[in-house]
UniProtKB/Swiss-Prot annotation:
Oligomeric form and interacting partners: Homotetramer. Forms an RuvA(8)-RuvB(12)-Holliday junction (HJ) complex. HJ DNA is sandwiched between 2 RuvA tetramers; dsDNA enters through RuvA and exits via RuvB. An RuvB hexamer assembles on each DNA strand where it exits the tetramer. Each RuvB hexamer is contacted by two RuvA subunits (via domain III) on 2 adjacent RuvB subunits; this complex drives branch migration. In the full resolvosome a probable DNA-RuvA(4)-RuvB(12)-RuvC(2) complex forms which resolves the HJ.
Biological process (GO), any one: DNA recombination
InterPro entries to which the protein is assigned, alphabetical: DNA_helicase_Holl-junc_RuvA_I, Hlx-hairpin-Hlx_DNA-bd_motif, NA-bd_OB-fold, RuvA, RuvA_2-like
Encoding gene per record: ruvA
Keyword Ion transport: no
Compartmental location: Cytoplasm
Cited Gene3D superfamilies: 5' to 3' exonuclease, C-terminal subdomain (1.10.150.20), Nucleic acid-binding proteins (2.40.50.140)
Descriptive protein name: Holliday junction branch migration complex subunit RuvA
Region (Flexible linker): 135-138
Known function: The RuvA-RuvB-RuvC complex processes Holliday junction (HJ) DNA during genetic recombination and DNA repair, while the RuvA-RuvB complex plays an important role in the rescue of blocked DNA replication forks via replication fork reversal (RFR). RuvA specifically binds to HJ cruciform DNA, conferring on it an open structure. The RuvB hexamer acts as an ATP-dependent pump, pulling dsDNA into and through the RuvAB complex. HJ branch migration allows RuvC to scan DNA until it finds its consensus sequence, where it cleaves and resolves the cruciform DNA.
Domain III: annotated segments: 139-196
Primary location recorded for the protein, binned into one broad class: cytoplasm
Natural source organism: Borrelia turicatae (strain 91E135)
Length: 196
């Protein structure tokens, strides 16, 4: 499996980007939200999902692990393939989709192009309770252990710092950031939160 591609964006299309990672050039299908976050000539790290079929090979790209996990859960639903899953994630942000599934918000889900009430029901049945944020929050302190220690060294209480990391990792603004920007965002927000 190709887990991640690092390179420069040389072309942006309506539903895909083209990345040069020498000596290769990859076309990667992305959601409209992901596409909007990325700029031409930008050096990026894109998490990927490789879809292999007899008649086609496609790469799907994501800005973070959570978006990819929602995509992978979506394609496990009977009747939803990778292109349909990407269309859904272009109609509603992955974290809003996840919350809507937990609330069984038929109206919000069925407003997405190609999803009617029947398909929304299938999605709820298959995915309710499986798209929780627990993984993001619980892994946050481990992933940002050095950052946590740096802030503790500044005189802040470890428990308060760990709680702030978990809380900030669940907000939309953090989740939509590229990995390279997440640590700086966390540092700034934690100091603001704990100093205020």
């Amino acid at each position: 499996m190709i887990n991640k591609i690092c390179g420069k964006i040389v072309e942006k299309r309506e539903s895909s980007i083209v990345i040069v990672a020498l000596p290769f050039e990859f076309e990667i299908l992305v959601s409209s939200f992901c596409n909007a976050e990325l700029g031409l000539q930008e050096d990026v790290e894109i998490l990927t999902y490789l879809h292999l079929r007899e008649d086609e090979i496609r790469l799907f790209g994501f800005l973070n692990v959570s978006e990819r996990e929602v995509f992978e859960k979506l394609i496990s639903v009977d009747g939803i393939g990778p292109k349909a899953a990407l269309r859904i994630l272009s109609g509603i942000k992955y974290n809003e989709f996840r919350d809507a599934v937990e609330r069984e918000d038929v109206k919000l889900i069925s407003n997405v192009k190609g999803i009617g009430n029947k398909m929304a029901g299938k999605i709820f049945l298959k995915l309710r309770g499986k798209l929780v944020k627990v993984n993001e929050a619980s892994s946050g302190v481990l992933k940002f252990k050095e950052l946590e220690q740096s802030i503790v060294n500044m005189g802040f209480d470890r428990k308060l710092v760990a709680a702030a990391i978990k809380e900030i990792m669940l907000i939309d603004e953090f989740l939509m950031l590229r990995q390279v920007d997440q640590e700086q965002f966390l540092f700034r927000e934690i100091l603001r939160k704990l100093s205020g």
